[in-house]
Amino acid sequence: MVINIQKFISSTCNIPIDMLKGKISVKNHDQYNSYNLSIILSWLLHPTKKYGCKSTIARLHKCNMNRVHRLHNLYSKNSNFKSFVDKALQDYKITYASN
């Protein structure tokens, strides 16, 4: 599922998928936002929040587990960031969800 989210963000935001996987460094603010969006969507759409989920998401994005935790806290506390993520979440569900 994380790979589907990365493909969605890559095609929507027009950035290389290798950047979302952490293989290429982020070059500007828009790419940084897309990278963070990929991480938080991976967490929010994960079917079970069990032990090891954050480490799997962090590994697939080549980031620290603490980043996943900080983004989730930001999502919970910042209404602007929450609306930005919720819009992308809705777009993802429209594109990939099966009815």
Regions found by a protein language model. Give the residues of each.
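Residue-level detection of the helix-turn-helix DNA-binding "recognition helix"
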Residues: 69-77
